[in-house]
Amino acid sequence: MPSYDPPLRPPKQARSQRTLDRISQASLELMEEGGVESATVAAIVERAETSVGSFYARFSGKDDLIRYLQDRIWSEARNRWDAALAGQDWGALSIESVVEGVVTLLLRSFRADYHQREVLGRERRQDEEGARRVFEFHQHILATVTPLFLAHQKEITHPDPEWAIRLGYRFAVGAIREILELEEAVGVVDGAATADGLIPELARAWIAYLGAGGPDPASAGSGEVDFFDPWG
């Protein structure tokens, strides 16, 4: 894969950082309200209470801004994920609780910036940079959760535990993404599955695929662990 240069170097001065933060926040708000097209440079600087010159001192144009916002959102998501993992003593948990915890954190992670990712993603979903961001984020999550699962490898009866972890991850992420898309489109429908209600079901399915958890996989999803939540 070709090398990639970030669209912006971090500001060295606090004042410059505050201006950048205001531009970023204003841009995201406008894009969430009316799509990428509504976030014109004029509208962005007006809401950010800054100048057109300040915008172009940082970005060559809106395409450059979008690249920066995408990098920022995925980087912050990765940092919050790492903080959530670090906030739990995973070694003290059963494999059922580990799986449930990972699914819980996946839902919180994807839900936190879901709309922003979707708004920005529609603009560049098929390009190489967008694919790189998504790939690297998921690879990072898999690299961090695989050791948590393999700490219970003796309980996993699947002939290829690492493959079962990867495929189970894709299954869980796909289900979470689908239900978040549904909730975004039509809201929470009475009688329909909710994203939070999906957690124990995905945990049971993943545990069953791993061949772990003893004869009663229904013990998953008990919710006895209160996981640290950096998403608020």
Which residues does each predicted region cover?
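Helix-turn-helix
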Residues: R22, L30-D64, Y68
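Hydrophobic alpha-helical bundle segments that form small-molecule/ligand-binding pockets
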Residues: A83-A92, A112, R117-E118, R125-E128, ...
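Hydrophobic alpha-helical connector segments
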Residues: Y68, D82-R111, I165-G168, I199
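Short hydrophobic clusters on alpha-helical segments that form packing/core surfaces
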Residues: I23-M31, A77, L106, A172, ...
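Amphipathic, non-transmembrane alpha-helical scaffold segments
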Residues: S16, L20, I66, Q70, ...
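Generic hydrophobic, amphipathic alpha-helix propensity
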Residues: R15-S27, I44, L69-W81
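N-terminal intrinsically disordered/low-complexity leader segments
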Residues: M1-R18, A185-V188, G214-G232
